[in-house]
Amino acid sequence: MANRPAASALAGARSPSERQEPREPEVAPPGGDHVFCRKVSGVMVLSSDPPGPAAYRISDSSFVQCGSNCSMIIDGDVARGHLRDLEGATSTGAFVAISNVAAGGDGRTAVVALGGTSGPSATTSVGTQTSGEFLHGNPRTPEPQGPQAVPPPPPPPFPWGHECCARRDARGGAEKDVGAAESWSDGPSSDSETEDSDSSDEDTGSETLSRSSSIWAAGATDDDDSDSDSRSDDSVQPDVVVRRRWSDGPAPVAFPKPRRPGDSPGNPGLGAGTGPGSATDPRASADSDSAAHAAAPQADVAPVLDSQPTVGTDPGYPVPLELTPENAEAVARFLGDAVDREPALMLEYFCRCAREESKRVPPRTFGSAPRLTEDDFGLLNYALAEMRRLCLDLPPVPPNAYTPYHLREYATRLVNGFKPLVRRSARLYRILGVLVHLRIRTREASFEEWMRSKEVDLDFGLTERLREHEAQLMILAQALNPYDCLIHSTPNTLVERGLQSALKYEEFYLKRFGGHYMESVFQMYTRIAGFLACRATRGMRHIALGRQGSWWEMFKFFFHRLYDHQIVPSTPAMLNLGTRNYYTSSCYLVNPQATTNQATLRAITGNVSAILARNGGIGLCMQAFNDASPGTASIMPALKVLDSLVAAHNKQSTRPTGACVYLEPWHSDVRAVLRMKGVLAGEEAQRCDNIFSALWMPDLFFKRLIRHLDGEKNVTWSLFDRDTSMSLADFHGEEFEKLYEHLEAMGFGETIPIQDLAYAIVRSAATTGSPFIMFKDAVNRHYIYDTQGAAIAGSNLCTEIVHPASKRSSGVCNLGSVNLARCVSRQTFDFGRLRDAVQACVLMVNIMIDSTLQPTPQCTRGNDNLRSMGIGMQGLHTACLKMGLDLESAEFRDLNTHIAEVMLLAAMKTSNALCVRGARPFSHFKRSMYRAGRFHWERFSNASPRYEGEWEMLRQSMMKHGLRNSQFIALMPTAASAQISDVSEGFAPLFTNLFSKVTRDGETLRPNTLLLKELERTFGGKRLLDAMDGLEAKQWSVAQALPCLDPAHPLRRFKTAFDYDQELLIDLCADRAPYVDHSQSMTLYVTEKADGTLPASTLVRLLVHAYKRGLKTGMYYCKVRKATNSGVFAGDDNIVCTSCAL
């Protein structure tokens, strides 16, 4: 095996056949020390007790798979021991070659450090990449004697020359793997080694994935949410641990003299070997010198990095410490083949040059030109070290990677090359995200260029404020340096949220300007928080800070909550806040009340087109246009115009939007609308694939449908046109039913069997994903004032906003959401943190309402009169999993209602506090139920508030001072922003445990990292690989792939939305409903039968259940899992609602 420690230097050369002979178990010599692998019984590393260096060997040289959660195998015979001083105590250490179980004989070798403190005989466990933690015994330290005695080597250098590496990440990396050094790939250099390698594992020639897969069995991986799980892994806690604290600073370091071309293996600068053959065997000399290159000094026994010496603080490079093409090429030649074995070796030179340059440049200012710093190279080295611990074959860092362009190309090569492997590794998913953030860093511009950019177009007032606080902003930027956060073990740093989060920033949210520059994440949140601070009123500052604070204090208040993803603005707000493009509203509800074709076309080309031009999502009520003649469809030509208009706007837009047409089920064209999408469209002139449809269902339809389902014969439904329907759409409840039945009694309309229309609805939903279903009477019944005679006639694009709209006024809503996963700490939900997040979100959205521009006068009136906001949630399912709960559990049912109540209570209290501080109530407050002291939840018989005292105090204050806003809680999908937060969307369960989408740019993968970590805690070795193979075959459904698990097993919690009973999901929405004064975008997830059919009764049953539970939204999307295992159908994927989906 290549790069094996020179064991033969002490034991004498043996033939390959001798090394392969099985040996009897041995015991430690009396008075000596022995080291054993805790995971394997009967395998022991033995030491002799001669004078001089201790000799160690494995009692069984065959490959031995360690137990659960261990991915390493032991392969060796005798290794040289060394004496070294560790934290003032004499210690014995040895270095034993180990090999990855899947890599086998491909020559991939790492080095494990074995050691203990001085004292009587004891045991010390072999460190592996699983735990890296040791039981420390007290072996007797042999004294060096005679002329061949080896003096103690100097303390090890930092692993690559960066001073910060003395402070390694405590959540993952060297400190968790202190027993294992980084590995490299090298070919065999002798026949015996070739034979040994070839016999070690028969899977040598496997692909990258299979060759690396066993590392996924490594124990507890880096947990980005370390506070989410209090369970410990299988690693052994040391009896005695001697670690250097962060505050101690780096230990004194004596770096070895670097090897220069022409140096002999025995050169004192390298540390001459002491065993036989060391002067003639270069590999033996190099390996014997590995003791001088252990990892960071804070560990008790640190890993050996490489046989190639690292370069010290006085490296003696043949060129100056200045980054130029000539110098970089010279260093590459100087390092020679070592760069192939150690891909990050060039980074050491880059780092030292950057450190020297930092001494010459002045402190960073707004005008400072962006440059790659020591911390940038440190971030790359951190990522490479983590990837090497996964035994990945890394390309060497190119000599020109000190330039932003080539560093970006190298990071891209790594991301594209290893992206497919994230499906099985949460750690790799996180590390590739770090590389994408580094790629973003290479395109960063100075603050001055960013502020002056015409493409960014910053608000003038914001620019002035930023200039006034230049020094503080530069300090904050340095404090949030990603590398500093990593090495100081700051949990949940933004750059570690995963690959999908980083890509979403890079591809969608960060502005591009100046040809090739990109807004940095820090600049984006500075833009948003700075603008919010500029527009915050005196009352808002008192609410947020408890006093009349400064701009800088308000900036920090918003910035930290945004940067930490406690609150998330809507997509238009994230893109436009802080710029002079003041359009931040998300949802628009338009009801032109047009009754003719010409009036409808004017509304579409006027109001609707203006909103689409600002990328707003539209809900368009078309009920009034209903003049079909026999055999014709009056509405379809107008809808074709709308479809083309949406397609034209989206073609040139970086943020596609959409429109949804609302009709009541008695509209004369309803059957034509149900056939306008996909394969149901009979002819191209009737096809409208770029828009959605929604049915505004009265209770009467479901009352009659239930009668049919109960067995009643000849239950009918009537369709009316404009001339016969009169003002039917203006009424709801009993008044609607009386008028509808009166029209039927008079013989008006077309009568059809009700089951025919129900089947057409279900067929369209299962085939195209729509129509969406909303319940007209529930919406109007729970609105803040009586709408009888002017009933609310539609909702927005995503069915979660409830607003009146008319020819004169359009409904407008501004959105934001709170990240519930950030409220979980040590498996406990922090309701204080939730209240704080909701308060900040309410203040943010009120600033948006005050500052936003509107595309039409109707929208301006709707925005100003009602000041409606929609505070949503994201990460509910993620929070549930982090707490160790299942959505089916009684504990979660209670938590679900508790969260909704706290959100509404905190939002209304904040809105009321604004009025207490001098803000005026919304215009229609006096006609609302709030004026009389009534709350939304009081109209629900199942509501049982737990904060009755707070509600009563709010009631009194609300009646006295009013409310700044008319509506508060709207549970939207949060499809886009949940990706940058790396949590589940909205309130829905995870769609799948491995999201995969193939586009022309490649495959996008987003694994459920919580599931991967639970799998690693449960299985080990081949069992883990088998479990993942089974999950792959079953679309990552744990219930289908692992049916033998005990019902109480932790893995049973990881169900997908398709695995849950849909009636349970409807019940969860109903439990929240009293505290959701808008509505909820509830998607239904159904699975085809084994024969590929989906009974219509399945969807009918679910819609009837949603109606009976009193919901406002009966179905947003209908997503169908195919029985053929070919994926999930969810309607037209080309239309993405990023406006209200955040």
Curated annotation (Swiss-Prot):
UniProt site positions, description: Important for electron transfer: Y1116, Y1117
GO cellular component: host cell endosome membrane; host cell plasma membrane; membrane
Region (alpha-crystallin domain): 294-400
Subcellular location: Host cell membrane; Host endosome membrane
Site, Important for hydrogen atom transfer: residue positions: C587, C813
Basic and acidic residues: compositionally biased ranges: 16-26, 164-179
Residue spans of biased composition, Low complexity class: 277-303
PANTHER family named in the record: RIBONUCLEOSIDE-DIPHOSPHATE REDUCTASE LARGE CHAIN (PTHR11573), RIBONUCLEOSIDE-DIPHOSPHATE REDUCTASE LARGE SUBUNIT (PTHR11573:SF6)
Family: Belongs to the ribonucleoside diphosphate reductase large chain family.
Protein name (record): Ribonucleoside-diphosphate reductase large subunit
The species this protein was found in: Human herpesvirus 2 (strain HG52)
